[in-house]
DNA sequence: TATAGGCCGAATAAAAATACCGGTATAGTT
DNA sequence: AACTATACCGGTATTTTTATTCGGCCTATA
């Protein structure tokens, strides 16, 4: 009936996404990239550190545009192992 | 100091994303696609109708995977005109 | 009848996104 | 040495939004 809490797997997934975004930022400062992507530096920092585990689609899209990385690439890399549910 | 309300532009952007996802779903039922993507049917319906304007990145990623569409494609199409800020 | 698909509104807990504060560490300047 | 500026981190507080379930309602079709 309510929104369920994030699972440990979802937390991990968010951390991995953050690591990739941080790596893509390279030597640029958080302030510069966040401003270019139209978000606050605090938000970008929390995404990079995984404290925002399930950020909004358009937030990541804006970041990917600024950082010149592919959204599909990010999604695939962040969700590595599909549970492979048996039929 | 607080999270600002969604702008009309963000609402529109969400609606456009919904339209694209709906089109990609084709003849498949909401229940089938939502289940395959690991979310409730109600949530998918709200995304398609734009009532969830800024869905989570991994939510859209799961949908894009099931529907076999590109996240980059969705992002570009949903945010068509960059404001073209003058230098 | 009844079954399947879809639409809508209310209610709820959890989380996003933001700002502010202090702390740390490094690099450059006076 | 003292000061200044930049950059990053962690916590707190706040409002808005997500994601979910439930119930009802409608339409087509077997």
Label every model-predicted segment.
Chain A
Residues 27-29, 55-58:
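Residue-level signal for the short linker/turn that defines the boundary of a DNA-recognition helix
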Residues 1-27, 72:
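A short, Lys/Arg-rich alpha-helix, primarily the initiator
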Residues 26-46:
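Short alpha-helical DNA-recognition segment
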């Amino acid at each position: 009936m309510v929104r369920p809490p994030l699972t440990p797997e979802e937390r991990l997934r968010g951390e991995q996404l953050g690591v990739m975004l941080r790596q893509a930022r390279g030597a640029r400062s958080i302030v510069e990239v966040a401003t270019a992507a139209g978000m606050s530096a605090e938000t970008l920092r929390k995404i990079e550190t995984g404290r925002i585990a399930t950020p909004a689609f358009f937030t990541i899209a804006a970041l990917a545009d600024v950082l010149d990385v592919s959204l599909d690439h990010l999604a695939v890399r962040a969700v590595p192992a599909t549970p492979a549910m048996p039929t």
